[in-house]
Amino acid sequence: MKEIKDLKKNLKYVFVSYHDPDYYFGLNVIHKAFPEAKIISTAQTAYLIEASKDMKLDVWKKQLGTDAPDTLIVPEVVDTLPAIEGNALEIKYDKNDSAHPFVWIPSLKAIVGGGSVTEGVHIWMADTQGDNDIAKWQQVISTMKQLEPATVVPAHFVSSDYTPKVLDFVEKYLADYRQAAAKSNNADELTAAMEKAWPQLPGKDNL
């Protein structure tokens, strides 16, 4: 927010790309700083936030303490995004998985990956419960790669150079996780298998 204000940019929209709490718990702070900015998302993202926000706050409130949001904002639903400084922005998602949208900027050949793209750290898989859900995620990554992007912005990363190689990382990680899940009898076995497959990767608490 400080950078936006320092640049004297007129923030008009905040696009919420995913329904996990880390994507919307801070919206009240952004709204207070930029009250004129519209907070928007796809219909599916707004629906999933509305359906789970109170339960998610109950889960996280104790851990967050005074940092817990005092207001939970559900985004306004949109089908399209406005252009920014002449650059068109397109909401993309696989037809079988509307819960994982991402933003494609054709003029820059850039993807803002949303919740589907993580780099250099164990991927949070707790909300991806079944093999079918992993397969849908893999298809989203395939859809991204078919666009042949020059730049990919991950949602979660330790460090990133914003290159398309992040999609290779997610693709390989999901394949390893899917294989390990099929062979594991419980969560401990699955965690051990992923730690063995990716011994140098930080973020083991995500498993």
Where does each model-flagged region fall?
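Active-site metal-binding motif and surrounding structural segment of the metallo-beta-lactamase
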Residues: M1-I40
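Divalent metal-coordination and catalytic microenvironments
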Residues: I4, Y18, I39, V103, ...
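Active-site neighborhood of phospho(di)ester-bond hydrolases with catalytic His/Asp-centered motifs
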Residues: K12-D20, I40-A43, I111-G114, L147-V158
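Active-site environment of divalent metal-dependent phosphoester hydrolases
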Residues: H19-Y24, A46-I49, S98-A99, T118-H122, ...
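Compact alpha-helical subdomains of small soluble proteins
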Residues: A37, N186-L207
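Metallo-beta-lactamase
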Residues: Y47-A99, P106-S107, E148
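Active-site-proximal loop/helix segments of hydrolase catalytic cores
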Residues: A88-L147
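Divalent-metal (often Zn2+) His-rich catalytic cores of metallo-beta-lactamase-fold enzymes
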Residues: W104, A110, A135-A193
